[in-house]
Amino acid sequence: MSDKLPYKVADISLAAWGRKALDLAENEMPGLMHMREMYSASKPLKGARIAGCLHMTVETAVLIETLVALGAEVRWSSCNIFSTQDHAAAAIAKAGIPVYAWKGETDEEYLWCIEQTLYFKDGPLNMILDDGGDLTNLIHTKYPQLLSGIRGISEETTTGVHNLYKMMAKGILKVPAINVNDSVTKSKFDNLYGCRESLIDGIKRATDVMIAGKVAVVAGYGDVGKGCAQALRGFGARVIITEIDPINALQAAMEGYEVTTMDEACQEGNIFVTTTGCTDIILGQHFEQMKDDAIVCNIGHFDVEIDVKWLNENAVEKVNIKPQVDRYLLKNGRRIILLAEGRLVNLGCAMGHPSFVMSNSFTNQVLAQIELWTHPDKYPVGVHFLPKKLDEAVAEAHLGKLNVKLTKLTEKQAQYLGVSREGPFKPDHYRY
């Protein structure tokens, strides 16, 4: 089916702009450039037909071209209807790589785009690179006949990893998977430092609101929530956290944040950010108690955290201010400003995470694809992690760009600590 349409993007004439953006990003993505230097000659991904379902951004374009440089064939779709950067998609299409993504897809178009990535000229996909689990779920439910030919899955994000573990527990996961999200150089960098910058970018571009002096409510205090809370506090907001986990709640309290329930916080907040990866976080009962023109947004993967359906069914009026910014008039006379329709605000209203931090995440993705493709015997059906040594290698590949100088252990010190001078330096159970 995909032979009839080599790509589908919003505007192929944006390719030149996209290429310039890629050139800039490459200089900020030392990990991926290091992968090209190490593996372009040996082509460890030769024969791999990778179907990718991950936000079609400039940074993802650099990842795609890295996979191709390492020998893979690639077909791509975005994992969110609003996250595609159309100039990046155009640049990839112009380079001859099949991509099916544009900003503002309908749900039906979104599914169609994913389905275009399943068949290559030499046969169906044999590798999956996923973000959120939609591609993985589609193959397992609608195209199970393709499963036997798939060597592995690498999963990018917390939500997708939860999905893999749920599938494994139910006995329905049929393909080995690597949990990229919980590599230290992903979760402790992308989730934390990436969100710390891109959340504010999304809110500011959408509303131009003054954050200083406001009350911001952050639902969830995992790595994403921590980054969001730091950013909002840094801009002068008073931050309130909501949490279900006593450990995370205690962490938030020890950092000086007020921790309470959404039932209480909804009356205080001016800005609300959901980061939980769970459903039903902000409901109609909360909207009804919010202040006038409260800003509500989500930075978790799916649009299930905010009850947008309630707003659409119960608001007196909905006014679109500009793309991805809607103002709802409630029956009580107060207004709610909803960003990105409750989907990822940093990608719907801004450009997502900066290139440098995405280089960390995507270098892990490349290594995971190489591991699964070249060492299939090491990975039975299940959810696996990249070795600690590779995690450290990803970090080291990014140090030079920041002029970081590592201290080198002496042989005596290494023996004292019981580690190799070359690493890994921490046990697998170490919590960074």
Curated annotation (Swiss-Prot):
Cofactor(s) required for function per UniProt: NAD(+)
E.C. number: 3.13.2.1
First-level EC class: hydrolase
Binding-site positions, substrate: 57, 131, 156, 186, 190
Pathway(s): Amino-acid biosynthesis; L-homocysteine biosynthesis; L-homocysteine from S-adenosyl-L-homocysteine: step 1/1
Record-listed N-acetylserine modification sites: 2
PROSITE patterns: ADOHCYASE_1, ADOHCYASE_2
Residue ranges of the region described as NAD binding: 183-350
Keyword terms, alphabetized: Acetylation, Copper, Cytoplasm, Endoplasmic reticulum, Hydrolase, Hydroxylation, NAD, Nucleus, One-carbon metabolism, Phosphoprotein
Modified residues (N6-(2-hydroxyisobutyryl)lysine): 186
Protein name: Adenosylhomocysteinase
The organism of origin for this protein: Bos taurus (Bovine)
